[in-house]
Amino acid sequence: MAQRREPDPPPPQRRILRTQTVGSLGEAMLDSEVVPSSLVEIAPILRVANEVEASNPRVAYLCRFYAFEKAHRLDPTSSGRGVRQFKTALLQRLERENETTLAGRQKSDAREMQSFYQHYYKKYIQALLNAADKADRAQLTKAYQTAAVLFEVLKAVNQTEDVEVADEILETHNKVEEKTQIYVPYNILPLDPDSQNQAIMRLPEIQAAVAALRNTRGLPWTAGHKKKLDEDILDWLQSMFGFQKDNVLNQREHLILLLANVHIRQFPKPDQQPKLDDRALTIVMKKLFRNYKKWCKYLGRKSSLWLPTIQQEVQQRKLLYMGLYLLIWGEAANLRFMPECLCYIYHHMAFELYGMLAGSVSPMTGEHVKPAYGGEDEAFLQKVVTPIYQTISKEAKRSRGGKSKHSVWRNYDDLNEYFWSIRCFRLGWPMRADADFFCQTAEELRLERSEIKSNSGDRWMGKVNFVEIRSFWHIFRSFDRLWSFYILCLQAMIVIAWNGSGELSAIFQGDVFLKVLSVFITAAILKLAQAVLDIALSWKARHSMSLYVKLRYVMKVGAAAVWVVVMAVTYAYSWKNASGFSQTIKNWFGGHSHNSPSLFIVAILIYLSPNMLSALLFLFPFIRRYLERSDYKIMMLMMWWSQPRLYIGRGMHESALSLFKYTMFWIVLLISKLAFSYYAEIKPLVGPTKDIMRIHISVYSWHEFFPHAKNNLGVVIALWSPVILVYFMDTQIWYAIVSTLVGGLNGAFRRLGEIRTLGMLRSRFQSIPGAFNDCLVPQDNSDDTKKKRFRATFSRKFDQLPSSKDKEAARFAQMWNKIISSFREEDLISDREMELLLVPYWSDPDLDLIRWPPFLLASKIPIALDMAKDSNGKDRELKKRLAVDSYMTCAVRECYASFKNLINYLVVGEREGQVINDIFSKIDEHIEKETLITELNLSALPDLYGQFVRLIEYLLENREEDKDQIVIVLLNMLELVTRDIMEEEVPSLLETAHNGSYVKYDVMTPLHQQRKYFSQLRFPVYSQTEAWKEKIKRLHLLLTVKESAMDVPSNLEARRRLTFFSNSLFMDMPPAPKIRNMLSFSVLTPYFSEDVLFSIFGLEQQNEDGVSILFYLQKIFPDEWTNFLERVKCGNEEELRAREDLEEELRLWASYRGQTLTKTVRGMMYYRKALELQAFLDMAKDEELLKGYKALELTSEEASKSGGSLWAQCQALADMKFTFVVSCQQYSIHKRSGDQRAKDILRLMTTYPSIRVAYIDEVEQTHKESYKGTEEKIYYSALVKAAPQTKPMDSSESVQTLDQLIYRIKLPGPAILGEGKPENQNHAIIFTRGEGLQTIDMNQDNYMEEAFKMRNLLQEFLEKHGGVRCPTILGLREHIFTGSVSSLAWFMSNQENSFVTIGQRVLASPLKVRFHYGHPDIFDRLFHLTRGGICKASKVINLSEDIFAGFNSTLREGNVTHHEYIQVGKGRDVGLNQISMFEAKIANGNGEQTLSRDLYRLGHRFDFFRMLSCYFTTIGFYFSTMLTVLTVYVFLYGRLYLVLSGLEEGLSSQRAFRNNKPLEAALASQSFVQIGFLMALPMMMEIGLERGFHNALIEFVLMQLQLASVFFTFQLGTKTHYYGRTLFHGGAEYRGTGRGFVVFHAKFAENYRFYSRSHFVKGIELMILLLVYQIFGQSYRGVVTYILITVSIWFMVVTWLFAPFLFNPSGFEWQKIVDDWTDWNKWIYNRGGIGVPPEKSWESWWEKELEHLRHSGVRGITLEIFLALRFFIFQYGLVYHLSTFKGKNQSFWVYGASWFVILFILLIVKGLGVGRRRFSTNFQLLFRIIKGLVFLTFVAILITFLALPLITIKDLFICMLAFMPTGWGMLLIAQACKPLIQQLGIWSSVRTLARGYEIVMGLLLFTPVAFLAWFPFVSEFQTRMLFNQAFSRGLQISRILGGQRKDRSSKNKE
């Protein structure tokens, strides 16, 4: 199945060019949306034509004709893209329609138009105006727009026919025109005068905000200003500063909603007069301007926010300031990523605003102050935004799509940080075009030498504050304190272990202590290295640095160098008997004087004094915060030396409690790690090292360059290197262990996993309603309810329902049932399960007890009956049994009470009523006295029960003809009660019952006089309410469900969701506010071009195995498919297919199970549904509450038209609190090309009317003046909603669905300059509303039950959580919903699940370093919109755009928290290639983060322990992963050196050398990381916590059986390769991983292309190393270490080589193998070249693989060459081991001779290559003879050498092992030096050699796979292993993979 199944796009509109049939052309043109972008103005006319066509085809024709004319006027030369085709098609249609429509028209077209226009006005507009209420504003708006278009056409037709327009029509048109101005499409608030009756406009808070904005008193308007109705201060700002009209409309609504929402929180009871509260204004203003004021303070400027002294004007002034900021922000486009640039613009414009209001006079002109950029239309966009935007755009072009080095272009951060320096004011206002900010680059300036001379100051600014240079040194530079700490600890440990006894106590011995103090010399050297690095890596930013910063860098180097000298000298002087280097230093400084250790100690104390100060500040974070924020010069001087002054990264320190928690975490971790390193790795290695250094080895196996070197340094390095690498890496292992323990404890204290199973849910269900009302229902603010809420819920059990609980029960029922109904709508449960899970909606006034959902009470009645029947009068026994099971008690009591009510309701007759009352009063008496069992005979109960069930069944049917049967049933019941059950009772009862039937016995009474019993019954029940139906149905369930409902719901997902939701109610969450008082929020989803809704074709299209998506889904979700069929009332699939109306239902069902936009939208719209229900529960009066929300929904249609109804109010509140914007970047492109995705998005908008779609509109504008008409693209940010649905006039045709433009804001140019996704979010963020902003990806999902908790979650923004600041990002947990697809998907979802739960829990608390990891986090919207938005967008460097939002938030004093009582669904990748692409993207992103300024600043501004947290949870994880792989390399190359040099043989007698415990410990650590231990630990803990440790153990074993270790080892290679490559060479890019279902087989060539460089090459290299070691190694045979090392590393090799084939579906199926081989051969031998994609030819792929070297720079290429040299070691070592030379000749000439052999072979290959080109066509025979001779010569020489014998078979193998790596090394060097090789003209030979190597590698990989494919059981085993997860869900995967072939063959036979 395709990785990313794009729906096949329907043909674009250009198909109209072709000659088509009349019908199809007509259909194509009917779509008024498929219009070229340059003719966008005619779309409304075509819409109207479609609308009126059914009622008057001639008018439709005239509209289209007018559209054609207008199109011709707009683009006379048809120069726009697609215009000529469009016009031609339209003309063809007009020619056809002219003839057909002429017949039915009136005398002339003018008359036709006039009469139709009047008809339309009367029929639609007047009818709507005359309606009882004019609430249907949307239809009115639509009608006015249509009328306006009709008049435009009418006027044109009249002009053509020279007819005057009638006065009556002109008068009508004037009315229409006036109203069209008022009735414009709106987003949320209709602000026109006629909309005051709309529910949302009636809210006092909205009225207050609107009134405040309309106060324009005292504003100086321009001279020619005409006053408009409802003018407000934003109109004034627009006229003064030249903002766009739609920007003003958008921000007006934004500001009103913002103020209204904050205002209502100040007044919880909104009865006051609508006057805006000053506190609300102050709160919003504080949030909006906190960053601006901080910026002014930082630069030492006074802010421009001057408030007037007159109190009455203060409010207006504040609103003006806020309005101005929002208008600037709303039009700033890409400048929104540069918050301080916006501050600069605002600073000047606000000052101008103040000047105008104060009436200031300009000292320059002597006139009143005016805005520098005037108030013409679009002045702000053209004159302020565009120049800065163009600078960004130019810089982005220089990045060449991210290929250039970061240091040669300025990214968003560089441009923004220009405004962090006081120099930014040189830019001036109006801004100087020649300012250095705008200045061109050095290259551009070289072209304009003359200008440079005249204005030498204006050179390219260069980078600002920081340079992102590709270098590993960034890891040391950003986290220098960490590396210094580890290096110094290592030195100290080695010194202690080396000297004295090796015990830690030895440190107290004088000499040892003094030696340990040498770490301070190392510290000084490291400081010097850091200072030098700082200068080297910041060199390219020197132009932007101030003198103070440059001075600091130089002084840092000077000071560090001085300290190195001082430390070294004083150390030398501290020794009495100095030796070695100490003596040398002493001699330099004339040192024969006595020793003085005290001098060294003094030096150390002085050196440490700054550190002591910082340690003191660390203990008191509040002092540190104060100092960093302070602007006092002395403070600034103090801080200047420790860290350069920077606008961000100040005052980030946490509270003392948080600091204590994470400090303790790290102290425990570091002590454990260092103790382990010392006792297991370093101390045991010292003894063997000393022994090795004592031995002298004189015999070598190769030519030794330094035969007399002392101490065997090579051996020591080979021994210590892996251990030291593991020392630096294993903190990651300790982090995994400690964080798992801490996370587990933390989770347990948060009460996670208290309800894990259905059994637990049942046992706790009694306390759920209480917890529900405590958590999800707003409480009164009385003191009692303020107490900790849920402590009481344990004890709270509702048996009886006191009257005060009526409302609580009703609220619980409404919400619970909404959740269960959503389960049913999602097909997670069947109808029967739904009935069992529902709680009665309607409270029954006759029952005074809680009515539990039937799934708790199922089968309780039959069991109770059996117990009662067999009780034999033992009352107490039965009572005991009932007391144990409270649900049984409830069931019995409810059934009895309902039975009583039912009989009393049915029976109307007086006499019967009396009898029944007597019976019930007797029974009640017995119940009260507790003598029921002893006094009554209950053995007849089952019979009575049977009769009662029959009665209920008749009542369910409710048919007239059953009345007689009911009478019989009632008589049977009466007889049973009086004769059997109550036989001992008073005889009068019997008398009453039986003697009353007939008056006399002896005489035949006439029929009409005979009186029947139960003749008067209320049956059938005519007034059947929903409540009555529900009651009867429930009673029927209680009585008839015999089997236990223990497994209800049976669906695993439904169980998981129910248990999680129930559990979350007992977790700590903020109390719920009323909907009206909650924080408002938006959801923003970026969408590019993924699937919106699966098409039927896409669902049924089969892959090569004959499997369609639909078939696959049916097999994976069998229960949900059955439930779906039940919901749509179909028995089977055939029935479903037969009904066309269900096609869309089927598409939706499938789309809800994929990763589609439809699924995401449905999930997010649950928020709205939840808000509407909660608003109802908040506002409903008791009577309405008890009637229920269902009753309200039933009347919603009519109610929505009246603004005052409860339904309308609920809708209004939901609108005010929640907005959902989907940013469909390419919507207009899709729409104009007729793409199915645009139609599907429109369908979504129609289904959910409150969705808004934002998109970037590209409009071509043609310039008519020029000869051919040049095109210019204009870009807009647009927002649309679904237009009200209108049927074409007088037609029965389907409803026409269209969108409606709300805002269209012009942009300065293309919006996408950097990374696509953040830019897409940024353009749409202006259309979001509210105080919270949730970012949701389009592969996410949400649930109804979680949506109810949203208002609680938003309250977290107002709590400090024991810290120093409120949260700015709320983290949420995610649930990965794609885990059931395959084993890989299961591993991936487990890994992701553990990260998004336990991982982030620990990051947030205690570590305080949680950032933002993808979505569904919720941002404090105002905080982030004033600080650069919700992500960063610079090309490549911000590849992981989301984490940078977290970095930015933290650096700007934000606070990120994590909350686990709410969850959001998320889809993940499900195939190995998809997963690897995802891992590659993340690793690339981490590589770029390593170079970034944000991480550097965090590393330097955090305190030491928080910095450790930051490192090990971001790039540290990837660097440690890389060290893990490096350890294996270093170990093996070290062994290679020992083995081939003969040193291992010489040392093999040393027992310590053989039993090397430290190496065992080190490599065991490496193996732990390799097999995924770091992943598995937190995974197991989280599963244990949430599903029980028993389950965790089972899952762990299952994962191992399904080769999880293979998967994790393989991913290790992916992470290492892409992280390393990004750091060395760059080349990071966004990789779209696809959202499809992967059960398709990946071809061998595809796997080879993807994994060749990342895994296969490295795997083969390690294999050769292991083979050499296996052949020549001596020392370890039979030792545990040997086995451990061999097994572990061979496991890695085999995994890296064969995992892609192991995890490839059908990877071992013989037919597939044969196809793969053919495909591979075709690919490898295909010629490349321009236009040949890498998938088609090896040559193209190979060239693309080398692309990263082109942009790598000198450093990268040098490193590549240096690393390639390692391949020459094999040849050097192995030639001396050939039998000819071994032990005989160690001359260097032997090695030289081996190079002659290689060169000889290469020359022959080259010669044959040249021969092929020269002779193969004309002299083919000659060429073949030469080839044959060469081959025979080679064979003859080989046979001679073997016969003599000069060489052996083993030697041949050794030669292969020696020469293969050499060739590869030469190839790597040639690739790195490609330009040089091309100049030499031997590039084609290099290519040939490379192809040869690829063929050999391909064969090596393919042969074992093909061999295994011979055995059929291998394929069977692989399928089992891959799809075990799916098996457990009843998925017959063999049928999926090999499936449906039978179906196909049978179809073929037919």
UniProtKB/Swiss-Prot annotation:
Residues 1-481, 527-552, 621-655, 734-1511, 1582-1591, 1677-1682, 1777-1787, 1850-1851, 1916-1950 are cytoplasmic. Interacts with UGT1 and phragmoplastin. May form a functional complex with UGT1, ROP1 and phragmoplastin. It is an enzyme of class 2 (transferase). Glycans are attached at N577. Keywords: Cell membrane, Cell shape, Cell wall biogenesis/degradation, Glycoprotein, Glycosyltransferase, Membrane, Transferase, Transmembrane, Transmembrane helix. It is found in: Cell membrane. InterPro entries: FKS1-like_dom1 (IPR026899), Glyco_trans_48_dom (IPR003440), Vta1/CALS_N (IPR039431), Vta1/CALS_N_sf (IPR023175). The chain crosses the membrane at residues 482-502, 506-526, 553-573, 600-620, 656-676, 713-733, 1512-1532, 1561-1581, 1592-1612, 1656-1676, 1683-1703, 1756-1776, 1788-1808, 1829-1849, 1852-1872, 1895-1915. One of its GO terms (biological process) is (1->3)-beta-D-glucan biosynthetic process. May be regulated by ROP1 through the interaction with UGT1. This is Callose synthase 1. One of its GO terms (cellular component) is cell plate. Gene3D superfamilies: Vacuolar protein sorting-associated protein vta1. Belongs to the glycosyltransferase 48 family. It comes from the Eukaryota. It holds the Pfam family Vta1. The keyword Cell wall biogenesis/degradation applies. It is a multi-pass membrane protein. It catalyses: [(1->3)-beta-D-glucosyl](n) + UDP-alpha-D-glucose = [(1->3)-beta-D-glucosyl](n+1) + UDP + H(+). One of its GO terms (molecular function) is 1,3-beta-D-glucan synthase activity. Its main location: membrane. Its EC number is 2.4.1.34.
